[in-house]
UniProtKB/Swiss-Prot annotation:
HAMAP family: GTPase_Obg. CDD domains: Obg (cd01898). Its cofactor is Mg(2+). Belongs to the TRAFAC class OBG-HflX-like GTPase superfamily. OBG GTPase family. The lineage of its organism: Bacteria, Bacillati, Actinomycetota, Actinomycetes, Bifidobacteriales. This is GTPase Obg. Residues 529-563 are annotated as: Disordered.
């Protein structure tokens, strides 16, 4: 099995965010000191990085499933969870990342291009990690001072991507099968490709580094092309993409072929036609030179054969009339290789400068609008408002006549994932958020009634429930209610002196009530004094008669009250 793999499908998943904590602070003499649950850690992301030491995508064929680290849950004492570790995956320079499209269980095909990792260090985040859930200390506010719940961490992004390697070489050797391309790259570099005397010996591209004095450049040996390669015939369509990144195209022509209806000029025009058809389908990167405009050279091979030598001298003027540089070589005797080597080196140096100038000019001409920088992947505020444009509500009807309402939107779907439906307070908090966003108003506008089925999200993350409209976003809006707002612990309210602060009117009313009580006591004492209770020594102080402050008359021995 070849160790060269230039296309693979990889399943990537970002790490899940950690759950928030719903801890309650406990101290000596303060059994209920308020919330102190920390936030969950964010999940790690899956990142592809262009690495010059990577040469193939073979590792991803045997290990196609890659998952980043998940964040840990928050803890009490306001301790946040740790962030999941990012998964850094090296790929060869020249790798293009595509979105994979296709039905589940079937072969995927490339969709939209996500990134073009052409240079060393280029990065692409293909699966974002999930955000950690907020702890109850982050959910607290002036009306919800002791939340008994926390938010769950979000799931990491999960998707299939296709990695496609397009070799980055300075020179591409193109030609018919058995034209001597592999022999040429073996003679000019240290690469040892498979060489045999039958067509299509080369099944994968070979890259070799060639040294010419103080400079060096790379050559790509592309498998043999035949007429119809741009439409998928032979092996050409699989490897024509390796020509996209080369700046110079070298036609290797076999002057010793014995096949009928073939000659150097017809071979050249046939291959040029295939390259032109393939170039029409390409979307070139920034600063790239279109394939038809790239410089060409013609290499007439196998001149060690006398008949081939004569044919090369005969067709050379025809190629020169087309403005092409022609080199006569023999890979067997190494004749003409030195001249070819230094000529290619000079041409490569010239093209590198031209490409650099093109990229700089294109970059300066672009208008870049930078978005506002925000810390984190989303606002850390719990009660996020919004407008109706951030979600959609559609009325759906099933085949059996049942009707349901489908809610789609980034915020509603994320809030559903963050909610622990085993906690009634968390469910009520979700209802408040949806009402504040305007979901309930939109449901009413679409004709929804209490008890109708509502679905939020899609796929495995979808949540179904019977709609029960809230009352002005919760109990905290009900004046005079003893229920308290969601997240309000009445035990804490009793311990907080701020909740018992009296108004001036209440202070005046309490003062007048106290003064009236004192006046009543003074009047009772004056009545006892006038009755002589305090001046008569024969009166028992413990006796309670009708003149006493607490007396109601004294009973006689026969049970009758004395007058």
């Amino acid at each position: 099995m070849s160790d060269f793999v230039d296309r693979v499908t990889v399943h990537v998943k970002g790490g899940d965010g950690g759950n928030g904590s719903a801890g309650i602070r406990r101290e000596k003499y303060k059994p209920l000191a308020g919330p102190n649950g920390g936030n969950g850690g964010d999940g790690g992301s899956v990142v592809f990085v262009a690495d010059r030491n990577a040469t193939s995508l073979l590792d991803y064929r045997f290990m196609p499933h890659r998952v980043a680290g998940s964040g840990t849950m928050g803890l009490g004492d306001n301790k946040d969870g740790s962030k999941g570790e990012d998964l850094i995956l090296p790929v060869p320079c020249g790798t293009v990342v595509f979105e994979a499209r296709g039905e589940q269980g079937k072969a995927k095909h490339p969709g939209a291009q996500l990134a073009d990792l052409r240079h060393e260090g280029d990065r692409c985040v293909v699966a974002q990690g999930g955000a950690g859930g907020l702890g109850n200390i982050a959910l607290a506010n002036k009306t919800r001072r002791a939340p008994g719940f926390a938010l769950l961490g979000e799931l990491g992004e999960e998707r299939d991507v296709i990695l496609e390697l397009k070799s980055i070489a300075d020179v591409a050797l193109v030609g018919f099968p058995s034209a001597g391309k592999s022999s040429l790259i073996a003679a000019m570099s240290s690469v040892k490709p498979k060489i045999a005397d039958y067509p299509f010996t080369t099944l994968v591209p070979n890259l070799g580094v060639v040294i010419a004095g103080d400079s060096r450049y790379t050559i790509a040996d592309v498998p043999g092309l035949i007429p119809g390669a741009s439409e998928g015939k032979g092996l050409g369509l699989e490897f024509l993409r390796h020509i996209e990144r080369t700046e110079i195209i070298a036609h290797v022509i076999d002057c010793a072929t014995l096949e009928p209806d073939r000659d150097p000029m017809s071979d050249y025009h046939a291959l040029e036609n295939e390259l032109a058809l393939y170039a029409d389908k390409l979307e070139l990167p920034l600063g790239a030179i279109p394939i038809p405009e790239r410089p060409r050279i013609v290499i007439l091979n196998k001149i060690d054969v006398p008949e081939a030598k004569e044919l090369a001298e005969f067709v050379r003027p025809e190629f020169e009339k087309l403005g092409l540089k022609v080199f006569e070589i023999s890979t067997a005797s190494h004749e003409g290789l030195k001249e070819l080597n230094f000529a290619l080196s000079a041409l490569v140096h010239e093209m590198r400068e031209e490409v650099a100038n093109r990229e700089q000019a294109e970059e300066e001409a672009r208008v870049v609008i930078k978005p506002l920088e925000t810390k984190g992947r989303r606002p850390r505020r719990a009660d996020e408002g919004g407008s109706a444009l951030e979600f959609t509500v559609e009325r759906r009807e099933l085949g059996n006549g049942e009707v349901f309402f489908e809610v789609r939107g980034v915020k509603p779907e994320r809030w559903v994932m963050q909610t622990n439906f085993d906690n009634d307070e968390a469910v009520g908090y979700l209802a408040d958020r949806l009402a504040k966003l305007g979901v309930e108003d939109e449901l009413r506008r679409k004709g929804a009634h209490p008890g109708d089925e509502v679905r939020i999200g899609r796929g495995a993350r979808m949540v179904e429930f019977d709609w029960d409209p809230t009352i002005s976003a919760g109990a905290e809006m009900l004046d005079g209610s003893n229920l308290g707002a969601r997240g309000k612990d009445l035990r804490l309210e009793e311990l907080d002196p701020r909740t018992h602060r009296r108004s001036n009117a209440e202070r005046r009313a309490q003062y007048h009530e106290m003064m009236d009580a004192r006046a009543a006591v003074r009047d009772a004492m004056m009545a006892e004094r006038k009755a002589g209770h305090w001046a008569d020594p024969t009166v028992d102080d413990d006796r309670h008669d009708e003149t006493s402050l607490f007396g109601h008359g004294e009973s006689s021995e026969d049970g009758e009250t004395e007058e």
